[in-house]
């Protein structure tokens, strides 16, 4: 697919598919496609769950209701096993994270040329359809979790308790306060960074592999045939990847918030 109607080189093809539809420059650049798809999928998630919740019956449930109930029960069981405090927000938060991240990841299942080609017909030169291949989106999610970690740490332990946790662990001596503060600060900051980069790295790599496989179709019939097999194999494997990454993001969020609720 070409952005301007001319044939793209392999390098140009890859670069084109990895470029966001954006406005602004530098720090103030807005990735319009990532924002639209992430918000749109979030609204779709809310609409589906709200519709199923309103139509839920005690009789024989439909297929969609069964699926939703399975997801809710799975997330609820995960929260009960992992979160040791009492907070009615955690289970809905975990459900939202798991389903929303999975839906954003699932956009990677759409063949790489389909939506960008349609966008090109509408005059849109660039379009990335997988929000979690944008590090800005994954960091936004992780920063939201980080804010909750800080909030509940202070709410449960108090300001003084939170400060003591940062300055008197792991070495409980006033002389070791600078060392403790450094170690605990690094540990605290590493949580959102690891959350964001793990999700971004796995999905970005998966998207890149799909793009490389798509290049094989423009070579010759033998490479195109091989590409079909590779694409099918990677598609099956990638279903596991996108599900696992959504699960890991959810579980780490629960673990971090459980740690924030521990009052030493």
Curated annotation (Swiss-Prot):
List the GO molecular function terms: proton-transporting ATP synthase activity, rotational mechanism
Cystine crosslinks = none
- Give compartment(s): Cell inner membrane
Its membrane topology, per UniProt? Multi-pass membrane protein
Q: Which InterPro entries match?
A: ATP_syn_F0_a_bact/chloroplast, ATP_synth_F0_asu, ATP_synth_F0_asu_AS, F0_ATP_A_sf
Transmembrane regions listed in the UniProt entry: 29-49, 90-110, 111-131, 134-154, 177-197, 208-228, 235-255
One biological process GO term for this chain? proton motive force-driven plasma membrane ATP synthesis
Q: How does it assemble?
A: F-type ATPases have 2 components, CF(1) - the catalytic core - and CF(0) - the membrane proton channel. CF(1) has five subunits: alpha(3), beta(3), gamma(1), delta(1), epsilon(1). CF(0) has three main subunits: a(1), b(2) and c(9-12). The alpha and beta chains form an alternating ring which encloses part of the gamma chain. CF(1) is attached to CF(0) by a central stalk formed by the gamma and epsilon chains, while a peripheral stalk is formed by the delta and b chains.
List the NCBIfam families hit by this protein, alphabetically. ATP_synt_6_or_A, PRK05815.1-1
As for family, the record states: Belongs to the ATPase A chain family.
Function, in words: Key component of the proton channel; it plays a direct role in the translocation of protons across the membrane.
Its protein name is ATP synthase subunit a
Q: Could you tell me which species this protein originates from?
A: Shewanella denitrificans (strain OS217 / ATCC BAA-1090 / DSM 15013)
